[in-house]
Amino acid sequence: EMSASLVGSEMCIRDRDATAVFNMLSGYSEPLSWNELAVAPIWLRTKFTKLIRRETKHAKEGKPAKIIAKMNSLCDPGIIESLYEASAAGVKIQLIVSGICCLKVGIPGVSENIEVRSIVGNFLEHSRIFYFFNDGEEELYMGSADWMPRNLDRRVEILFPVLDDELKKRVRHILDVELADTLKAHVLHADGNYEKVDRRGKIALSSQDVFCREAMENVSKPSHGYQGRVFIPAEPVE
């Protein structure tokens, strides 16, 4: 239990949707709809496309619009095209992509509003987080899928909203810290090359060091499950 507090993936899924997923995987039933989840290979691509296009619509209406996405890989042509359209409309897009990224930044009139950074440190990060400004009604999602054809079209993947206010703050904190990383982050340029973040005038910050420190602080605090517990060794067998 204690190690699970230190090492784990962020997860928050409603029980009815979780049951429906396992029923689908087992062949017991095919859900006609979900309460909160979007599930690949049928519904997930449509969900992402709608979320991106909503930001595009808001930008065209002159409203503030923003997308932040963290993932391992980005190479889906359809998603990239939607991001280009959003950028051209004025949506500010910040992408944290640790691995493959086929999107090209810095194309005049197409991707000038897109920033891509990669953070590769001592630990392999596996979380996928998606933030949409939504005209001030901010929405946060987490899930298992990268923006790749195999994840959106050929695998069972899930996306779920982060609804609890405290969890939203925690997840947004993760994004903010990674966007502030000046030690391990590399920024993608228009020529396809990555370069270390320009640290001039900025605080030296490693996002993974911050998360490790916070994890150690959290695990050192007595949790509800451990309060009042005292280990009493058994008497030796005579």
PLM region descriptions:
Residues E1-G8, I13:
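Single conserved hydrophobic/aromatic residue that forms the stacking wall/gate
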Residues S9, N23, H173-V177:
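Short intrinsically disordered coil segments
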Residues R14-L32, T46-K47:
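Short, compositionally biased "basic patch" segments
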Residues S29-S33, P41-E238:
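PLD/PLD-like phosphodiesterase catalytic module centered on the HKD motif
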